[in-house]
Design a protein with these regions (language model features):
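Ferredoxin-type iron-sulfur electron-transfer modules and their immediate structural context
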Residues: 1-110
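Beta1-alpha1 glycine-rich phosphate/pyrophosphate-binding loop at the start
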Residues: 25-36, 42-48, 77-82, 114-182
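Glycine-rich dinucleotide-binding loop and its adjacent helix/turn
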Residues: 87-105, 163-184
Length: 185
């Protein structure tokens, strides 16, 4: 079996319905293949290419991919795509050497981000390796935004939340906690 070629979005829209339904267009068929082969770390890292919080989303995503799953054409239930994402996150090995690193040379550009929620953390994850200095201003004493304040810990354990956020913050993101921004002036 060969990996699905997803370079042409029109192709995978017609053929890989689950991937098209995913807002992040995560390569669902490939990460499931990797899990089937027992390659949990590789599956996690593939997920992380399109979504920097696979362990969090494996517990909290509303799973738009599953109603689109082609398996329902022949069986009653779709593939448990979201649960498989969680399996990869929970069973992965050490990934420190695979995570993005801060650029050795800074480009001299600074980016201010308001709120230490998933959007700002994702921006920092993408820009710090490109040499940007990212500073986050967070009104609360801890990062996470609504992930921390509105998702109960029985659904999203604090350890999972903090581990995935730390993967980004540990790249050298500057964070000012208890610093509410009331105006852009």
């Amino acid at each position: 079996m060969h990996p699905t070629d997803t370079r042409d979005p029109q192709y995978y829209h017609r053929v890989v319905d689950c991937q098209w339904a995913c807002p992040a267009h995560t390569n669902v068929p490939e990460y499931i293949r990797l899990i089937a082969d027992g390659k949990y770390t590789e599956s996690y890292m593939l997920n992380r290419e399109s979504n920097v919080f696979p362990g969090i989303l494996g517990r909290t995503c509303d799973r738009p991919c599953e109603p689109a799953c082609r398996r329902t054409r022949i069986e009653d239930e779709p593939v448990a795509i979201c649960r498989l994402k969680r399996v990869a996150a929970d069973l992965r090995g050490d990934i420190d050497h695979l995570l993005p690193k801060a650029a050795a040379e800074k480009n001299g550009k600074r980016v201010a981000l308001i709120g230490a929620g998933p959007a700002s953390l994702t921006v920092a994850n993408d820009l710090v390796p490109l040499g940007y200095h990212c500073t986050i201003f967070e009104a609360l004493p801890k990062p996470g935004g609504l992930m921390r304040t509105n998702i109960p810990s029985f659904r999203l354990p604090v350890e999972v939340l903090e581990e995935e956020m730390d993967m980004i913050l540990d790249m050298g993101v500057e964070v000012h906690y208890n610093h509410r921004i009331d105006s852009m002036k």
